[in-house]
UniProtKB/Swiss-Prot annotation:
<keyword id="KW-0851">Voltage-gated channel</keyword>
<feature type="transmembrane region" description="Helical">
    <location>
        <begin position="539"/>
        <end position="559"/>
    </location>
</feature>
<keyword id="KW-0472">Membrane</keyword>
<keyword id="KW-1133">Transmembrane helix</keyword>
<dbReference type="GO" id="GO:0043231">
    <property type="term" value="C:intracellular membrane-bounded organelle"/>
</dbReference>
<feature type="compositionally biased region" description="Low complexity">
    <location>
        <begin position="49"/>
        <end position="71"/>
    </location>
</feature>
<dbReference type="GO" id="GO:0015108">
    <property type="term" value="F:chloride transmembrane transporter activity"/>
</dbReference>
<dbReference type="InterPro" id="IPR014743">
    <property type="entry name" value="Cl-channel_core"/>
</dbReference>
<feature type="domain" description="CBS 1">
    <location>
        <begin position="661"/>
        <end position="742"/>
    </location>
</feature>
<feature type="transmembrane region" description="Helical">
    <location>
        <begin position="125"/>
        <end position="145"/>
    </location>
</feature>
<feature type="transmembrane region" description="Helical">
    <location>
        <begin position="289"/>
        <end position="309"/>
    </location>
</feature>
<dbReference type="InterPro" id="IPR000644">
    <property type="entry name" value="CBS_dom"/>
</dbReference>
<feature type="transmembrane region" description="Helical">
    <location>
        <begin position="561"/>
        <end position="581"/>
    </location>
</feature>
<dbReference type="InterPro" id="IPR051280">
    <property type="entry name" value="Cl-channel/antiporter"/>
</dbReference>
<feature type="transmembrane region" description="Helical">
    <location>
        <begin position="171"/>
        <end position="191"/>
    </location>
</feature>
<keyword id="KW-0129">CBS domain</keyword>
<comment type="function">
    <text>Voltage-gated chloride channel. Chloride channels may have several functions including the regulation of cell volume, membrane potential stabilization and signal transduction.</text>
</comment>
Length: 863
């Protein structure tokens, strides 16, 4: 049996835990030797900086959550096994769990009873306002990224183009290379003061947080600023990387910041919107921000919602779907309207947008090569994941215990390699006549749409511009494609320069062009191989970067290569093959399905190509799943995040809950001595974040019906009553919510008759068979919720008096969670895993048939 709670309201925020790491280490208060059941430690045990662990190595035996009952610590997912080393286990102890379930205590119930229907409506309306603000800010941020990168790239290509115009190849390369080094190294240096959490795409951190893991520094203001600056600089460095992953992380950080309206980094804790200061609401706002980031980056509001549902979030609801869709719509609208200069006639523009011709359809016989492209996408995607996983593992070992500036040197070396290869590829490629491309060009894709890396200015305004424009032969839509002269004579262009010496979205726009003769087959073959290798070695550098656009570029190049080979024998449109190849390659490394198909269709405006896209995506996922998991699953494992998959590991399904639970538990009584509470909180050997609360002692005589009971004789039982969190106990100590004596008085008639009875009922509550019910709570739900968001001082700085510590008690009954989920000791591992994962628990007490606490399960015990 387990007890559930269907209430969707707030739970207490545990966000201050990481800032209270000094509370227990500095205290020197003498306390009683009386203890509860002290045991081998259970988790969630450490603050998120792992400071307790640094002082006590005895706690490391169970870092992975496995005890001696079931062998070595390892994580097994759907395919393959990942074994954690001792160093990995030590890293895992840094991560705490979030408190998604509601803390349904007496003060919360009292708050609900006195809250009017209007206040409930205002809270719901406030969530919609916050989602609106998330959409607006994410849209503005996407616009700022686009404009900044566009300005830098225009400057870089203009300066290089001046020397290309004069055919000074080496000088042009030095200018191009120097600018790339300047911005690339700067993007890496920005990460040093912020922390490496700001590097990479940030998607593993978003997925981990939404799964219930409190990842240090992953959602704070400093990381947001560092990620944004590094993103802008990195995209101007000439490296093959994309903006989408960082935009998802940035959107998540904006969502968390707007919804909470507080900052632990800045130590700013206003009382505005205190109702949303809990992990559950913050989780929803972060999910909304992640989806809005996708919508703003791709111009795909529906795809953004589906990405949040399918890939990012582990917990979803119908209400969250509507609010997320609203935020994605606002983000896309905000980006578009700013890009157009607030033009009243809106077009389907986006930060990253490609248009395809609506005239040309595929034949059903082409579904066979589309399926084969899906197979190739799955194979190359699995290969990329495997290579990237090994490269990341090598980096973690090679750079361990070495100066961080070596990571900056790595960026310097990679920029040198990338710039040299891409420049030389263009320099040694022969020129082609524009008439060769014009001869078969039927329609080009929509370059009026703005892109993160493209220039929106008039590229033909003077002869020193790098880009030479080829007019569209179609008279229906006066559109233009970018071609690069690159030392070619007038009327000629360099086909490789259009791919290697160009922005990524401009290169994709050329690959999606319906002209069959823009690129030759050897050019596509060489560039597909080069881009795949460079993308593989670039991923994992110490700067903000994403993989979506680079892998789209690899897939589109390969797909167009296949299309042009087939075009030698039958009449086909290579741009469709480029679209299918891009979709297959993205599915091959990310294993996204529904959201990816919708994003690709919204991105290219090619709804008529839905069937080929879905076919290639599904086949690529099936093929990739045969070999390994997605790149993000591997990164989560390598970063030692205690991530709970939707299904339990198959290697552990034969176990029971008794095989994984911690059998000895630190418990507290419903009414506990202040000295005992301080002792438990200060314990370095047993640093816990949740404590089961057991019932008060009961009289020996079960037949006694006196309402006041004879409490001189009693037995100590461990019957489970509820759960109290560490931060709640600290809050009660800080505000001195104490009783002068234990509220279990003798029979009032023996202490002075009716007057004492009335006093005791006023002091301790109504009489029951075993004593007195809890007194009226002295702390409101509003005060506790607001207080839990702040930074409390160490216990020895709370000015607690010795008399208070030695003689007073804390009545935990008004504040403990009365509706916690519990598991019976007969439960299987699979059932326990499902309960824990589905509800998003932090602690799962295990009880026997008598409802006595026999163990406890936390996140790391399930891995």
């Amino acid at each position: 049996m387990f007890r559930n709670n269907n209430n969707d309201n707030n739970n207490n925020d545990n966000g201050f835990d990481d800032e209270n790491k000094g509370i227990f280490l500095d205290s020197k208060i003498e306390i009683s030797d009386e203890t509860s059941l002290i045991h081998k430690p259970y988790h969630d045990d450490y603050d998120e900086n792992g400071l307790i662990n640094n002082n006590n190595n005895s706690h490391n035996n169970n870092n992975g959550g496995n005890n001696n009952n079931h062998g070595p610590s390892k994580v097994t997912h759907r395919r393959g096994k990942h074994t954690f080393t001792e160093a990995d286990k030590l890293k895992m102890t840094k991560f705490e769990s979030l408190d998604f379930p509601i803390i349904d205590n007496q003060i919360y119930r009292e708050y609900i009873r006195r809250t009017s229907k209007l206040n409930h409506m205002l809270k719901t309306f406030g969530k919609w306002i916050i989602c609106f603000m998330i959409g607006v800010l994410v849209g503005i941020t996407a616009y700022l990224v686009k404009q900044s990168v566009e300005f830098v790239n225009e400057f870089k290509f203009d300066q290089s183009g001046k020397y290309l115009e004069d055919e000074r190849k080496f000088i042009a390369f030095l200018v191009y290379y120097s600018i790339n080094i300047l911005f690339g190294v700067s993007a890496s240096l920005v990460i040093i003061p912020v922390g490496q959490i700001a590097s990479g795409s940030g998607i593993p951190e978003v997925k981990g947080y939404l799964n219930g893991i409190r990842i240090p520094q992953s959602m704070n203001v400093k990381t947001l600023v560092g990620k944004l600056v590094s993103l802008i600089l990195a995209y101007s460095s000439g490296l093959i990387l994309g903006p989408e992953g960082p935009m998802i992380h940035i959107g998540s950080m904006l969502g968390g910041a707007i919804g909470q309206v507080k900052s632990k980094t800045l130590k700013w804790y206003p009382k505005v919107l205190w109702k949303y200061h809990n992990d559950r609401d913050r989780r929803d706002f972060i999910s909304t921000g992640a989806a809005a980031g996708v919508a703003a980056a791709f111009g795909a509001p529906i795809g953004g919602v589906l990405f949040g549902f399918e890939e990012a979030s582990s917990f979803w609801s119908r209400q969250l779907t509507w609010r997320t869709f609203f935020a994605c719509l606002i983000a896309t609208f905000t980006t578009n309207i700013i890009l157009q200069g607030f033009d009243m006639q809106l077009h389907d523009y986006g930060v990253l947008k490609f248009g395809l011709s609506n005239k040309y359809l595929y034949k059903y016989s082409e579904l066979i090569p589309f399926a084969l492209i899906g197979v190739a996408g799955g194979l190359f995607g699995a290969l990329f994941v495997n290579l990237n996983a090994h490269l990341s593992q090598w980096r973690s070992k090679f750079f361990a215990n070495k100066k961080i500036y070596l990571r900056v040197l790595e960026v310097f070396i990679l920029i040198t390699i990338t710039s040299t290869i891409l420049y030389c590829c263009a320099a040694f490629t022969p020129c082609r006549s524009k008439t060769q491309a014009n001869g078969s060009q039927t329609n080009s894709l929509d370059t009026s749409s703005s892109s993160i890396l493209s220039s929106s200015g008039d590229n033909s305004k003077n002869s020193t511009k790098l880009f030479k424009l080829l007019n569209n032969a179609s008279g229906e839509d006066k559109q233009e494609d970018k071609f690069i002269a690159f030392f070619c004579e007038q009327g000629e262009y360099n086909q490789m320069a259009g791919l290697s010496f160009n922005s990524l979205d401009a290169a994709l726009r050329l690959l999606f062009s319906t002209s069959t003769d823009i690129f030759t087959i050897p050019t596509l073959a060489v560039f597909s191989l080069i881009s795949f290798i460079l993308t593989t070695i670039t991923s994992g550098l110490m700067l903000a970067s994403g993989l979506f656009i680079p892998m789209m570029l690899v897939g589109a190049t390969f797909g167009r290569l296949v299309g042009q080979v087939i075009a030698l024998f039958v009449s086909v449109d290579p741009c469709i093959y480029a679209l299918v190849g891009a979709s297959a390659m993205m599915a091959g490394f990310s294993r996204m399905t529904i959201s990816l198909a919708i994003i690709m269709v919204e991105l290219t405006e090619g709804t008529q190509y839905m069937l080929p896209v879905i076919l290639s995506v599904m086949i690529a996922k099936w093929v990739g799943d045969f070999f390994n998991e997605s790149i993000y699953e591997h990164l989560i494992e390598q970063k030692c995040y205690p991530f709970l998959q939707s299904q339990p590991p198959k290697s552990m399904i034969k176990l029971g809950v008794v095989d994984i639970m911690k059998t000895e538990v630190v418990t507290l009584h419903e009414v506990e001595r202040v000295s005992k509470v301080i002792e438990v909180l200060k314990s370095e050997q047993h640093f816990h974040n949740g404590f089961p609360v057991i019932e008060r002692p009961r009289p020996l005589d079960p037949n006694r019906k006196d309402a006041y009971g004879n409490l001189e004789y009693y037995e100590d039982e461990t019957t489970y009553s509820g759960l109290i969190l560490r931060n709640q106990l600290i809050c009660l100590l800080y505000y001195r919510i104490f009783c002068h004596e234990q509220p279990l008085p003798q029979n009032p008639r023996l202490l002075g008759g009716n007057s004492n009875r009335r006093y005791n009922q006023r002091r301790f509550g109504r009489p029951t068979e075993y004593g007195y019910a809890p007194a009226d709570p002295r702390m409101t739900y509003e005060l506790m919720t607001q207080s839990l968001a702040r930074h409390f001082p160490p216990i020895d700085k709370m000015n607690l008096k010795k008399e208070e510590i030695e003689t007073m008690y804390i009545d935990l009954r008004p504040y403990m969670n009365l509706s916690t989920i519990v598991a019976n000791e007969t439960y299987s591992y699979s059932e326990t895993y499902s309960i824990f994962r589905t509800i998003g628990l932090r602690h799962l007490p295990v009880v026997n048939k008598k409802n006595e606490v026999v163990g406890i399960v936390t996140r790391k015990d399930l891995l």
